[in-house]
């Protein structure tokens, strides 16, 4: 007959509560391993009841108590205290020594840690428990393993001659075997000494010391290593180490070994405060073995933003590289491989109800043999706006800029600009109209060896602009669906008189790209160094379809500029004398959400006089969800830096099931009949690990052939590479993915659809 014995022995809380704070961490790609929970057979077919604090409840088939000093229990022994229990065949409680001994197969469980082993000893005085030859499970965190000796204390679990894994099965996909593993409750992470990492029971890596997080919280420790192979750098391995400095501060250091180049060190420091945030990055390779000169390679990047007070803010963003080939050889999170320059800016902004002001310094680092741009050192702009008074408003824009060029043979300049304007706007539900009259005063002080550049220049130009637009709509039925159609025709007149400006240098001005909305701009050039002559009428129409729940499914626009007089203002004296004799190109674009999954976007600029397409771009996308999409695109452009471009491309990410995912992009140059860029990646995910393999092929842009020649007999060379990443659930964090791989490729993925949803 089952008997119940209650003893008044005092017992400190079981140390298994040290794992109470452990949280479950999701494995990659939506899958989580199942950890077996304790069953009724593990604790005996009895109903456990709570006991008073400080007492031990014992149930067994037989018991023997000697002089109130020792108690012997046998047969289905269950020892219970405050929801913690121990199940065994034999147990001894020695009150005089403050010790509990259990043997012949024990099971311990406190709701967080479940342990089965051969025997247990518990020191009540030191609150220490030892379990021998035991298997353990962290129930709220998908982790388990074996330990020859498992020691429990109030704050930690110590595993000796042990293993650790988050995978199920007798032969787990991965496991960590270590001489010693400590799992800490306070910091919620584990530490291992003299550890070896095994894949399918095969040792692949020895680690004298290793720490790893046990939850999704940020923890100091190793992140996932990445293995790559490329024709440029050879075999590569990157092992990042993360430092959780403070809740608002962290850092990462990552050595990158490249068999052909040497070892690069990467570092990142990030901070976040109530009113400012930023980061600093540094990459350094002291001796690039592939180069015959300029062997030191580096990149640094700094970014900082601060809200000084309600009206005043500061922003800084700057990147520098050691040489023109750096991005091509190593890539970067801060610039693309095909970029032609690095932009640097520091600015102080003031903004209140009527006044805005900005003090800014701007700089560019050119990548390749391009025309050297100007720094603005600095630029001060002040803008005042009166606000609306019965449709009328006035504004005053002021700017003072000093330009400095890196090329000492070219001009320096100071530019002052004052632009008062008066605007009138009249709005009704069915139409709106606006008129603007501006006076543009600009003064230059220039220093230049160019005889065509005048030392002091004053330019004064008026500008008049009138624009009117209708807003029409109707209900329309297409098939079985009801829609609301909008129709917005608009017309604009713009007048700016001609003034010869070839005696003014080009400091921050370029030709703006045209799209439908760009047709109705008041300027043809960015910056102030050229103000284009205009006596023109712009007309266009835009129409949209909205569903009954106000989802825009179609938007189409078409427009053109009609020049009453020829525009003679050009960027450079060597450009064609006039822009066009009458009409500019037709500009049209369309965005169409065919259904919930299919979308189409197309735009075109067509020259009716030359019967040629200046630019066009078309993209068709099928998007099942954020993890399943296919996009096909085609684009053309004529006379871009004296070159014509025609390119087709496809990008895709697709999940075949919960385990398999594939991503790829391919961009083909039809003009030169060559593959510009291609990448394919495959990922397999289980509940506790994932394997990501990718391969790429891209043009090798060698901008410094004197240091590292990659052009052979004038033929374009390509860089081919393979990347392998093994991702483990339960040891580190992973922020990468196949979507990220597409976004960081040479022609990164962009969603080209701009409908209002």
From Swiss-Prot:
Transmembrane segments: none
Pfam families: LptD (PF04453), LptD_N (PF03968)
Major subcellular location class: membrane
Places the protein is found: Cell outer membrane
InterPro entries xref list: LipoPS_assembly_LptD, LptD, LptD_C, OstA-like_N
GO terms classed as biological process: Gram-negative-bacterium-type cell outer membrane assembly; lipopolysaccharide transport
GO CC aspect terms: cell outer membrane; transporter complex
Entry keywords, A to Z: Cell outer membrane, Membrane, Signal
HAMAP family cross-referenced by the UniProt entry: LPS_assembly_LptD (MF_01411)
Family label: Belongs to the LptD family.
Task performed by this protein: Together with LptE, is involved in the assembly of lipopolysaccharide (LPS) at the surface of the outer membrane.
Subunit structure: Component of the lipopolysaccharide transport and assembly complex. Interacts with LptE and LptA.
Annotated protein name in UniProt: LPS-assembly protein LptD
